[in-house]
Every structure is written in C-alpha cells, then in structure tokens.
Regions:
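Terminal targeting signals and extreme-terminal segments of soluble enzymes
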Residues: 1-190
Length: 190
C-alpha cells in the first residue's frame, strides 16, 4: 500500500499518508475501495498497537492515481481490551472515506465459526476470471480471481439469475503474512 506515518499528534491521534499509485487502483485510475479501507485499518492498528476485529467504511469520493491521501486517525475510546477508532481519509480538503473500527481482543475460551464453508471446487479446477479491459497497473493485475458461481461477461444475457456469486480470490504476493489490511483489500469484493 505504501502508507507511512506523517505525523503523530498524541497517544490517541495521528496522521499517515500514501500516494495513490498504480497497483492499488481500479481500471478507472482511482483508489480501489478495499485498499482505502486497508490503509485506514493499518494506520489504526499501528497507532493503537491492537489488531482489528471489525471495521466498516463509507466511501464519499475518489482518490485518483498520483494524489496523496492523508489518513487522520482518532482513537475515540481506549478500553482495557477493545479500542473504538475512527479514520478520515482525505485528498486535500476532499474527504475520500471514513472508517470506524474496533481493535483489540477479549480473552474467550471458546472458538466457533457460525458460517460453514460451502462445498466448492478448489481454485486449481477453475479458470482465471476474465476482465473487460486491460488490468495493467490496477489491483486486478495483482490478484487471482476465479468464479465458482457467477457469470463471465460473455455469459451475460437478458435473463437475470439469483444474483449469487462465489469466487476464490487471492493476492499471490501476500500468500505468507496475510493480515487484516490484506483481508480488507479482498473484502471489497463482498
């Protein structure tokens, strides 16, 4: 992502900056939303020293390739185990996105997943997703995307389906060391 600290104003607020560059943008040459969320989460985690457990973003505008995006972080409530945080991402005076997040962890002796992974073919059994346009210098150039359920562009017709899509997605450069920022980038498909 290329996000770097650019000013810490105290224990509960600080600023990070990143240049929106090729590789973190869409085909329209603006910041991929998941990369914006990832930048905010990375800054929140760095300031708080805690791992993100939940985050949501509201996208308000676009950050174009070559622009510098500042990420202003505020730790609104610092609890013993959980911190509530906010990040406002701007290019100049223009707000790009706002992020609210909870970071930290609470000891709990039980672990459970409430969602069962669907029974689907492995990625190696599926073909790489086709794109309508050139993906050079976009986030899609860095990803492998394979449809399990869904229709490729050439399969679209006038007949609607149930709207359900299942897809394998990964960033091969980040196979080892997947963190919450990486999951935020991939989460933009949801």
């Amino acid at each position: 992502l290329g996000i770097e600290p650019s000013g810490v104003f105290g224990p509960t607020n600080g600023r990070w900056s990143m240049i929106v560059r090729p590789g973190v943008v869409t085909g329209g040459n603006f910041l991929w939303g998941g990369c914006g969320l990832a930048a905010a989460v990375a800054a929140i985690e760095e300031l708080s020293g805690r791992t993100c457990v939940w985050a949501t973003a509201q996208y308000l505008s676009y950050a174009r390739t070559g622009e510098t995006m500042d990420v202003d972080v505020t730790l609104a409530v610092v609890g013993h185990q959980i911190t509530q945080a906010r990040a406002v991402c701007r290019v100049g005076d223009r707000e790009i996105l706002t992020v609210n997040a909870a970071v930290g962890e609470r000891p709990f002796e039980y672990a459970h997943s409430f969602v069962k992974m669907p029974d689907v073919p492995p990625p190696s059994a599926l073909k790489q997703r086709a794109h309508r346009s050139d993906v050079s210098n976009t986030i899609h150039e860095k990803m492998e995307e394979r449809f399990v359920i869904g229709r490729e562009l050439e399969e679209l017709d006038e007949i609607p389906n149930d709207g359900r899509t299942l897809m394998w997605a990964r960033i091969p450069d980040v196979i080892d060391g997947v963190d919450t920022a990486t999951l935020a980038v991939l989460g933009d498909f949801v």
